[in-house]
């Protein structure tokens, strides 16, 4: 059973999605120093269910994603880490908090490209891009450009569509826990469509009702 250094965050990391961190807390600086001695250099990311990223004492969801370290820079100030989401896992047991969080994990089964319905994949892409395009017309900041380039691999693309979808963290966590790729695509379409209806309804209210 793999033992993995863990970095709980206030956001969800999906496979095939980038992750940029500014690390300043002492225990995570120690963690980064430790994992750089391993190949591949990786750690686990789980969503914090209750609590804060800094200081410990938080409660965490049990399904997360491994992050492979691509680059580390140490300018004057916090450590800057660039990583990429790789494989999903389930936490079996938290085994340590010092010198940094660690957990026994089991990897979740990877999806197969042959299982991807290309029609559903195309619909998910048009739905997510459509929602981003609508939000771009409002005075709202969106984390991803509407014309963002996605992977050619259908599994990676499905995860990336979930990752860039304009949803809250709990919706993202639900998508991360998808039991199969067809579920991932259908629920991405459904959840983003429902969110878009909410966005439009809120934006269509008269100014004195918003």
Predicted regions and their residues:
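N-terminal low-complexity, acidic/polar interaction/targeting segments
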Residues: 1-210
């Amino acid at each position: 059973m793999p033992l993995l250094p863990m970095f709980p965050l206030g956001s969800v990391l999906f496979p095939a999605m980038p992750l940029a961190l500014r690390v300043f807390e002492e225990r995570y600086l120690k963690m980064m120093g430790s994992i750089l001695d391993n190949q591949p250099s990786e750690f686990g990311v789980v969503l914090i269910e209750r609590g804060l990223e800094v200081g410990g004492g938080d409660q965490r969801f049990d399904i997360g994603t491994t992050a492979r370290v691509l680059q580390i820079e140490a300018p004057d100030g916090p450590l800057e880490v660039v990583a990429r989401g790789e494989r999903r896992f389930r936490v079996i047991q938290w085994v340590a908090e010092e010198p940094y969080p660690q957990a026994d994990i089991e990897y979740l089964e990877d999806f197969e490209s042959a299982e991807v319905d290309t029609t559903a994949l195309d619909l998910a892409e048009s739905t997510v891009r459509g929602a981003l395009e609508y939000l771009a017309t409002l005075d709202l900041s969106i984390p991803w450009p509407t014309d963002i380039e996605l992977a050619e691999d259908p599994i990676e693309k499905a995860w990336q569509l979930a990752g860039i979808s304009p949803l809250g963290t709990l919706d993202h966590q639900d998508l991360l826990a998808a039991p199969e790729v067809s579920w991932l695509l259908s629920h991405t379409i459904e959840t983003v469509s429902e969110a878009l209806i909410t966005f439009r309804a809120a934006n269509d209210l008269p100014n004195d009702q918003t």
